[in-house]
Amino acid sequence: MPKLSTELIKVFVYGTLKRGEPNHHWLTRNENGFARFVGEGTTVERLPLVIGTRYNIPFLLDKRGLGHNIKGEIYEVDEKMFANLDILEDYPVYYDREIQTITLNNNEQVQCWLYLIRKFPEKLLQKDYLTAYHNTKEQPYRERSERDLNIKASDDMSY
């Protein structure tokens, strides 16, 4: 029987997976795997973070040099949790992921996986660029259970 790796994977989250946000429960459910909060951090690269679709989904767009250094949280996760995050983010169909350098609040730099959108309508670049995502009453995130099943978020980016 092949042995599973016990090495943890660092993941940077900037949207609904952060503490206090609508999908944070994904990181706290034991059945999804293991996740441990490491600390808060900021991307070294500037990228546009926008809110899009009728469901108010935060998107980190693959457009280097635009936008801001993005604030978020770093977690160490096991392979099972990483696979479940891939399911949540619909990787590689909707979101892609890559390793980027993140600066922790103590100025230590670490390499982390983060999810971002590579193919998107240019219209998203006209939205306000955020430094950090927070779910708000003005732009409330809509859970998958509240969405129209006939409208895929990936088809709704121009909304």
Predicted feature residues:
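Glycine-aromatic micro-motifs
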Residues: 2-159
